[in-house]
Amino acid sequence: MAEVTVIGGGLAGCEAAWQLAEAGFSVRLLEMKPVQYTPAHRYEGLAELVCSNSLKADRINSAAGLLKAEMTRLGSLLMRCARKSAVAAGGALAVDRKQFSDLATEAIRNHPNITLETAVVTEIPETPTVVATGPLTDGALAADIEKHCGTRLSFFDAAAPIVSFESLDKEKVFF
């Protein structure tokens, strides 16, 4: 069985590990928690949501809803966990963060083709690897990625902008 290493146990890393394992690959999932946390992470589980608990609109006629429908049809682990941990949120799919993380962690730990290892990765392995470490990548690994790619990492924060009332054009806004 071919082996693939996935670095990072967040949303992308868990989904990548799951899909590879379901396709018959032997997956080694490397996650640095609980040995090392980032400033945003607080919980020891995988697939930790650090910002909003909302996975956005659930309507099929929205881009976010269509993506979720497609992921579900493709056997997405995270969509299954999201549905099982859903909380009331109007037309959005929102989840209980702890339950969502616990469900994803349990599924990853119990998959026969996935080995979960706790490790702070500082270099990209020479073997087939998916790097899914996100915007808070450990400094040593970020430097190794830069060495391989020849450029620094660039991420945009998902924090919502703050708009002051005084800055609004009262002729154009609706209250």
Give the predicted meaning of each segment.
Residues 18-80:
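N-terminal FAD cofactor-binding segment of flavoenzymes
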Residues 110-175:
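Predominantly flavin-linked oxidoreductase catalytic cores and closely associated redox partners
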Residues 59-64, 68, 76-91, 149-157:
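A short alpha-helix-loop-beta-strand transition element characteristic
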Residues 19, 107, 144:
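Rossmann-fold NAD(P)-dependent oxidoreductase module
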